Amino acid sequence: MNIKNILSERVSAAMVAAGLPEGTNPAISLSNRPQFGDYQANGVMGAAKKLKTNPRELATKVVAELDLDGIASKIELAGPGFINIHLDESWLAAQLNEVAQDDFIGVAQRGTTPGDESQTVVVDYSAPNLAKEMHVGHLRSTIIGDAVVRALEFRGDKVIRQNHMGDWGTQFGMLIAHLSDKLASDEVAETALADLENFYREAKVRFDNEEGFADRARADVVKLQSGDEACAKLWQQFIDISITHSEEIYAKLNVSLKRSDIMGESAYNDDLSTVVDELMAKKIAEESQGAKVVFINEMANKDGEAPVFIVQKSGGGFLYATTDLSACRYRSGKLAANRIIIFTDARQALHFKQVEIVARKAGLLPENVGYQHCPFGMMMGDDGKPFKTRTGGTIKLAELLDESIVRAAALIKEKNPDITDTDLTEISKKVGIGAVKFADLSKNRTSDYIFDWKTMLSFEGATAPYLQYAYSRIQSIFSKAGTVKNDAVINIIEPQEKALALKLLQLEDVVDAVISECTPNLLCNYLYELASLYMSFYEACPILKEGISGEVKASRLALCNVVADTLKQGLDILGIETMERM
């Protein structure tokens, strides 16, 4: 159910009938104020300018041809040529009654409408470096990517998750050398690697300061890359323990990534020399000071100086660039992706722009495959600097999430002193984790944001606790009513009911925008607006009050049910859990 699409088709047909060229954009948008209608068609203004004609006269012709019988109760001209559309309450109620019976709450599934076929979408997100614990810097890629993945799947696309973990590189040489020494002193690997962050720090200190250790580390890198069994065995221990740690974080975050989604950097090793050979054979890459590089002329500055994109170092080693080119080939070829989406912080935007240019030129990424790098801003402390511990250290993601649960538990206990320990444990986890996720997801993806415990854990405003409370409040009404009639007919009588119906029927449009722009904040905004409209409806339209007719009560309970389903589904797309009571 997409009102915007329905109106676009009708207004477009009227524009053609009024003599405008086919394909003229009707520019349908939601009205900001109810007195100007529910939707507006503003396309006549732009069309009149191109045709050098009077916009109001043109709009009058369009309105004369516009067939919205049974859909709109009133169509009116406003200003120089805007068309205001007031939707009929009976039509809205009919649409909402269909939505109430639909498993997908009115969101059409791919393949059910001509021209809206399911796509294969590869999504690269989270991608922590192994041999280190996940820190707060990994939060955004992990949860933004997961929200977009869930939105794609809800719409009916085939999604292939790719967790491009950093499981390769020169740092593993020093880690293997340090672990080898630990094991030689009879320490078991699990004990030595219990604190990955501390282990990494110890190895780095030895690499920087201990005579002979750096040489051993470099030698171990060569051995690892040459397939040495002993080094490979130690490397695998790092990988296994690191992945287990990441899986614990994903479970706590309610993120859908699984071990089977991992496609680490090492998975592309066998293809890297082939990629470079192809680039050289096609004269795309060339030798420069012993290295093999691509001069990206498409990005040359005003002096004609092109950026240098290194694909193989002078010593023979490969880089992230080479791995990312190989990934383009694998994802567009082996995985048959129609679209590739990558979530990393904004500092890598230039790198991925260069990767796309080189990959397309080399034929590693066909022109008909979409390639979308989605950069995001940073999480900042209240001092406006990157979020750190008080001593300036990196905050472990596990510790941040644990703190969110503790803080949520204190707030819930304060509001409900009689809550059982079992309920407190379950609810505080959902509220605490949900608060952290919503605070992040509700911000514009490309913007930095200030991390603030007080705001995110508030039960007022655009927060997860507010939305979770709205959902549980509806469940409380159902409990008091003793029944929920899903098949009851919804009637729209009061303005608050109409406002709620209009918002509910916008879900597909919002989900499509999230999918297109990879911006979960649009869904966060929608859910907050929906919950706010529900609260207004609840205050103005009694449901269980004595004297309310059975028909009105059933209608309003059915309306509540659609709101509850929409809140639950929307929060599920964001990876945030709901509860029946708080």
From Swiss-Prot:
Residue span of motif 'HIGH' region: 128-138
Alphabetized UniProt keyword annotations: Aminoacyl-tRNA synthetase, ATP-binding, Cytoplasm, Ligase, Nucleotide-binding, Protein biosynthesis
Molecular-function annotations in GO: arginine-tRNA ligase activity; ATP binding
Main localization (coarse): cytoplasm
CDD domains: Anticodon_Ia_Arg (cd07956), ArgRS_core (cd00671)
InterPro entries, per the entry: aa-tRNA-synth_I_CS (IPR001412), Arg-tRNA-ligase (IPR001278), Arg-tRNA-synth_N (IPR005148), Arg-tRNA-synth_N_sf (IPR036695), ArgRS_core (IPR035684), DALR_anticod-bd (IPR008909), Rossmann-like_a/b/a_fold (IPR014729), tRNAsynth_Ia_anticodon-bd (IPR009080)
GO annotation (BP), single: arginyl-tRNA aminoacylation
Enzyme Commission (EC) number: 6.1.1.19
Transmembrane regions: none
Cellular component terms per the entry's GO annotation: cytoplasm
SMART domains linked to this entry: Arg_tRNA_synt_N, DALR_1
Top enzyme class: ligase
Aminoacyl-tRNA synthetase is among the record's keywords: yes
Location in the cell: Cytoplasm
UniProt record similarity statement: Belongs to the class-I aminoacyl-tRNA synthetase family.
Protein name: Arginine--tRNA ligase
Annotated source species: Colwellia psychrerythraea (strain 34H / ATCC BAA-681) (Vibrio psychroerythus)
GN (gene name): argS
